[in-house]
């Protein structure tokens, strides 16, 4: 089992990132809650990880805190919740807010998350009410300057739309959400954060 990964951040295009660990490139998917705290390209990053092994693929997921990873692991144990949907949930709500929703049985807020309908929200509350395995809160990943060369930057709006689609939004919905937030000089991370916040209001 891979508990964490530390190396140079080579590329990041939500929800995927590439980390160079002593010359070996690891591809990971991460929730936006982790992306918001990533350093610049070329800096060192340390992430907690979860390795998912299936017959057709081995997938690695990265998280800025143990709490995020703990919630991810709890989510994918719920019937009908896969890794992609679990990342979308983590991208749209904080660990503490999710815990509060489950404790208060607040399905109304959960259904505003991408890919979550009424039945799924109710299932999350029922199955996680007594067994949330979130783990111990942790500081953001340690990072400092490294030596990797930056890659050409993608258009922030296009990158934001692609990230939202990868998180479960329909293309038209993703385009609309980003268009509402678009402003000159905003980064892809800023656009994604604003779009997700407007989607769950």
Swiss-Prot record:
<keyword id="KW-0227">DNA damage</keyword>
<comment type="subunit">
    <text>Homotetramer. Forms an RuvA(8)-RuvB(12)-Holliday junction (HJ) complex. HJ DNA is sandwiched between 2 RuvA tetramers; dsDNA enters through RuvA and exits via RuvB. An RuvB hexamer assembles on each DNA strand where it exits the tetramer. Each RuvB hexamer is contacted by two RuvA subunits (via domain III) on 2 adjacent RuvB subunits; this complex drives branch migration. In the full resolvosome a probable DNA-RuvA(4)-RuvB(12)-RuvC(2) complex forms which resolves the HJ.</text>
</comment>
<comment type="similarity">
    <text>Belongs to the RuvA family.</text>
</comment>
<comment type="function">
    <text>The RuvA-RuvB-RuvC complex processes Holliday junction (HJ) DNA during genetic recombination and DNA repair, while the RuvA-RuvB complex plays an important role in the rescue of blocked DNA replication forks via replication fork reversal (RFR). RuvA specifically binds to HJ cruciform DNA, conferring on it an open structure. The RuvB hexamer acts as an ATP-dependent pump, pulling dsDNA into and through the RuvAB complex. HJ branch migration allows RuvC to scan DNA until it finds its consensus sequence, where it cleaves and resolves the cruciform DNA.</text>
</comment>
<dbReference type="GO" id="GO:0006310">
    <property type="term" value="P:DNA recombination"/>
</dbReference>
<dbReference type="GO" id="GO:0009378">
    <property type="term" value="F:four-way junction helicase activity"/>
</dbReference>
<dbReference type="Pfam" id="PF14520">
    <property type="entry name" value="HHH_5"/>
</dbReference>
<keyword id="KW-0238">DNA-binding</keyword>
<dbReference type="InterPro" id="IPR000085">
    <property type="entry name" value="RuvA"/>
</dbReference>
<keyword id="KW-0234">DNA repair</keyword>
<dbReference type="InterPro" id="IPR013849">
    <property type="entry name" value="DNA_helicase_Holl-junc_RuvA_I"/>
</dbReference>
<keyword id="KW-0963">Cytoplasm</keyword>
<dbReference type="InterPro" id="IPR012340">
    <property type="entry name" value="NA-bd_OB-fold"/>
</dbReference>
<dbReference type="GO" id="GO:0005524">
    <property type="term" value="F:ATP binding"/>
</dbReference>
<dbReference type="InterPro" id="IPR010994">
    <property type="entry name" value="RuvA_2-like"/>
</dbReference>
<dbReference type="GO" id="GO:0005737">
    <property type="term" value="C:cytoplasm"/>
</dbReference>
<dbReference type="InterPro" id="IPR036267">
    <property type="entry name" value="RuvA_C_sf"/>
</dbReference>
<dbReference type="InterPro" id="IPR003583">
    <property type="entry name" value="Hlx-hairpin-Hlx_DNA-bd_motif"/>
</dbReference>
<dbReference type="GO" id="GO:0009379">
    <property type="term" value="C:Holliday junction helicase complex"/>
</dbReference>
<dbReference type="GO" id="GO:0000400">
    <property type="term" value="F:four-way junction DNA binding"/>
</dbReference>
<dbReference type="GO" id="GO:0006281">
    <property type="term" value="P:DNA repair"/>
</dbReference>
<feature type="region of interest" description="Domain I">
    <location>
        <begin position="1"/>
        <end position="64"/>
    </location>
</feature>
<dbReference type="GO" id="GO:0048476">
    <property type="term" value="C:Holliday junction resolvase complex"/>
</dbReference>
<protein>
    <recommendedName>
        <fullName>Holliday junction branch migration complex subunit RuvA</fullName>
    </recommendedName>
</protein>
<feature type="region of interest" description="Domain II">
    <location>
        <begin position="65"/>
        <end position="143"/>
    </location>
</feature>
<dbReference type="Pfam" id="PF07499">
    <property type="entry name" value="RuvA_C"/>
</dbReference>
<feature type="region of interest" description="Flexible linker">
    <location>
        <begin position="144"/>
        <end position="153"/>
    </location>
</feature>
<dbReference type="InterPro" id="IPR011114">
    <property type="entry name" value="RuvA_C"/>
</dbReference>
<keyword id="KW-0233">DNA recombination</keyword>
<dbReference type="Pfam" id="PF01330">
    <property type="entry name" value="RuvA_N"/>
</dbReference>
<feature type="region of interest" description="Domain III">
    <location>
        <begin position="153"/>
        <end position="201"/>
    </location>
</feature>
